């Protein structure tokens, strides 16, 4: 069946893409310091800001042939040689204005536009116009809101380029329209730093076809992977009624995929697992009745998918939607299962319309009970209100004290859900925006009793604004939120990345995949795909944590996913950066819909390591409690084995570079005997559900860094 390559939509409230409007700042080309432009822009002679064609990858050395720039491994030019020190838009080194001026597309070594124009004669004296600035009445401000100013607005006096009042670096920094704006860049984040190749880089292999665009994904208790998408005008799977399927279940063992049916549009939803192991998909978008009249409005949708490690009859069953609804509509919400098994749901657009308008936004949270049914109240959350319009898909992690770390835009806090209050506001993370539509990635590093389960959180990547010209951020921040003097430790990837996602690996490292070196989230808004795997070792010294892995051949841009499988490999799928599926690349659509899936084999299973897996793993119990209980683990190891880790792993719900609920624990162990082949180890569960909230987990036995096949357990 040939897929349609485009679709003309009629008038509708359903939105294909949220557009973030911002006021482009002017600049001072004579300034030798901060000109006033946004990151990734330069000030030209007429005092306007234009995109700079500059790479945000670490500089590469000059080539002997005088070629340079993005098409030549980001090579730079040597100002001392005969060619010249500027790289032109066409990738040639030179020294003329065609090579060196940013307005002509100079890529690196560019000249700064610091020459001011001559003052013009005038026949009148300067005069100040009558002030027409009106203080805000609703927290919006600036050119798009009648020129209003923030004045003494309770959240802050700076008017951001997006038209909201506040006092964070996102308001008072680059693009600030009025108020006490910073006159110099705020604590600039470090740029890209080259990383050495990993001695065992791993490998990518194309393994099959997802059947539907993989916008959302989760590893289910039956070991299979759920893919969930929005309503489309084409997928590769059909339901029994002849219509397209928008969800699928993939078996990594047999490489088979089967269609799943849902009733409400799950476009850009959130999700989490209930305590009983059921996957819950939350929120979505409106119905597209002209495409599929059988799929209804999903703004308040609640969808349930149940699978079991012991009951194979559940595999292939459709989503269940008994009619439960959220209290308020939510498009782009984030979800976290709490220690008491309730579900915390935060943020989302009410209608997909302009996020610069308060009436379109939902900067609130609501609580669902342990069965995934709303308790019926949406409560305003100040951090989200202040972050507008960068309030959607916030990063959320559960901490050891039962409170939440919540991050959005550039700001974060510790939030007490039970008390509905901010416990502690944390310092802003320097650099660009980190959440939608310039999402980077975030992980909570592996937890253990060695430091009393104290969490450290890493956030990497991001971007400056929602446009294909936006530079991406190479910097990463790492913070221990519960520390008394919590602050960000800065580090850098070897290149800027937007839409990069971090996946915890059983050996304690973090794999970073997917994304782009330029642009933002949205349809057709990114280019220069980042194809290389990056490996982060949190135990290494600062400056030595990053290495580069293997390189994929498949761009993974907007709407891509990555997650760990039971065998310790990583499944990568998706990339659908278009309104409706496009199957072949064209000049207008260089990055079509991607159905091919890949497996990334990490270093610990590469080469000779593949033969070192622990074998014959037996768990004393698969019903575990986070109350300090112990259980025995039997397994066979090589006769030269030196140490073991028992890992408790929750993959969470994956979408838009977020891994909601994702966490990994090292359990305390005893009884391991180095050099013995038949092992019996006692593992101790964490002391409470703050550390391991209830739900499905995978146990990995890891011997000398190599994991055995994982086994699903339920934690209560």
Where do the PLM segments sit?
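Immunoglobulin-like IPT/TIG beta-sandwich domains and homologous Ig-like subdomains
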Residues: 226-237, 245-251, 631-707
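Beta-propeller domains
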Residues: 189-192, 197-205, 220-261, 284-286, 384-520, ...
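Blade-edge beta-strand/turn elements of extracellular beta-propeller
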Residues: 198-207, 254-263, 305-327, 346, ...
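Beta-propeller and closely related beta-sheet repeat lectin domains
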Residues: 84, 156, 213-218, 245-246, ...
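Beta-propeller blade signature
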Residues: 244-252, 297-311, 358-373, 412-414, ...
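Fungal extracellular Ser/Thr-rich, low-complexity intrinsically disordered regions
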Residues: 16-28, 44-46, 50-67, 108, ...
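Fungal secretory targeting signals
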Residues: 1-19
């Amino acid at each position: 069946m040939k897929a349609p390559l485009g679709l003309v939509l009629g008038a509708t409230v359903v939105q294909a893409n949220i557009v973030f409007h911002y006021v482009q700042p002017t600049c001072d080309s004579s300034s030798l310091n901060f000109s006033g432009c946004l990151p990734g822009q330069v000030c030209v002679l007429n005092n306007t800001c234009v995109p700079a064609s500059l790479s945000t990858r670490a500089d590469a050395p000059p080539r002997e042939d005088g070629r340079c720039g993005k098409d030549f491994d980001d090579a730079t030019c040597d100002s001392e040689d005969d060619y010249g020190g500027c790289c032109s838009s066409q990738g040639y080194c030179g020294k003329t204005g065609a090579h060196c001026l940013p307005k002509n597309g100079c890529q690196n070594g560019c000249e700064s536009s610091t020459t001011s124009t001559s003052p013009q004669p005038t026949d009148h004296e300067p005069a100040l116009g009558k002030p027409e600035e009106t203080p805000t009445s609703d927290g919006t401000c600036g050119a798009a809101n009648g020129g209003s100013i923030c004045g003494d607005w309770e959240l802050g006096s700076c008017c951001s380029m997006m038209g909201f009042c506040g006092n964070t670096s996102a308001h008072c920094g680059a693009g600030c329209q009025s108020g006490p704006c910073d006159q110099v860049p705020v604590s600039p984040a470090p740029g890209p730093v080259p990383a050495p190749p990993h001695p065992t880089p791993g490998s990518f292999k194309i393994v099959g076809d997802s059947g539907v665009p993989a916008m959302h994904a989760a590893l289910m208790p039956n070991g299979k992977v759920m893919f969930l998408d929005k309503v489309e005008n084409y997928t590769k799977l059909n339901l029994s009624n002849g219509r397209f399927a928008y969800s699928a279940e993939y078996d990594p063992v047999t490489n088979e995929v089967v269609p799943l049916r849902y009733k409400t549009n799950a476009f850009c939803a959130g999700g989490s697992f209930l305590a009983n192991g059921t996957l819950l998909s939350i929120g979505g978008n409106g119905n597209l009745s002209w495409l599929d009249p059988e799929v209804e409005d999903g703004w308040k949708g609640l969808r349930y998918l149940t699978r079991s490690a012991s009951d194979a009859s559940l595999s292939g069953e459709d989503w269940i939607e008994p009619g439960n609804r959220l209290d308020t509509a939510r498009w782009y919400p984030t979800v976290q299962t709490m220690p008491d098994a309730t579900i915390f749901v935060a943020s989302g657009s009410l209608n997909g319309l302009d996020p610069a308008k308060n009436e379109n936004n939902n900067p609130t949270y609501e609580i669902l009970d342990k069965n995934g049914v709303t308790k019926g109240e949406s409560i305003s959350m100040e951090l989200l209100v202040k972050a507008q319009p960068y309030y959607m898909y916030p990063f959320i992690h559960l901490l050891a004290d039962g409170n939440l770390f919540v991050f959005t835009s550039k700001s974060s806090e510790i939030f007490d859900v039970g008390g509905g209050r901010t416990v502690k506001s944390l310092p802003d993370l320097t650099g660009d925006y980190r959440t939608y539509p310039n999402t980077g990635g975030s992980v909570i590093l592996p937890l253990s009793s060695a430091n009393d389960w104290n969490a450290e959180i890493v956030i990497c990547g991001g971007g400056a604004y929602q446009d294909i010209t936006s530079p991406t951020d190479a910097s990463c921040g790492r913070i221990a939120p519960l520390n008394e003097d919590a602050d960000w430790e800065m580090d850098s990837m070897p290149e800027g990345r937007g839409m990069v996602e971090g996946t915890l690996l059983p050996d304690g490292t973090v794999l970073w995949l997917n994304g782009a070196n330029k642009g933002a989230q949205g349809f057709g808004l990114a280019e220069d795909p980042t194809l290389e795997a990056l490996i982060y070792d949190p135990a290494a010294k600062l400056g030595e944590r990053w290495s580069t892995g293997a390189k994929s051949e498949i761009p993974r841009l907007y709407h891509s996913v990555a997650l760990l499988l039971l065998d310790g490999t990583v499944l990568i799928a998706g990339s659908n950066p278009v309104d409706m599926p496009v199957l072949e690349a064209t000049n207008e659509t260089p990055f079509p819909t991607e159905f091919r899936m890949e497996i990334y084999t990490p270093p610990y299973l590469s080469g000779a390591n593949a033969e070192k897996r622990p074998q014959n793993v037996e768990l004393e119990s698969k019903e575990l409690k986070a109350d300090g209980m112990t259980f025995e683990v039997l397994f066979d190891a090589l006769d030269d084995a030196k140490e073991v880790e028992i890992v408790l792993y929750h993959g969470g719900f994956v979408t838009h570079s977020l891994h909601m609920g994702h966490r990994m624990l090292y359990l305390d162990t005893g009884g391991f005997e180095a050099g013995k082949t038949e092992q019996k180890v006692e593992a101790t569960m964490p002391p409470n559900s703050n550390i391991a909230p209830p739900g499905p987990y995978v146990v990995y036995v890891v011997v000398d860094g190599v994991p055995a096949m994982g086994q699903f357990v339920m934690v209560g």
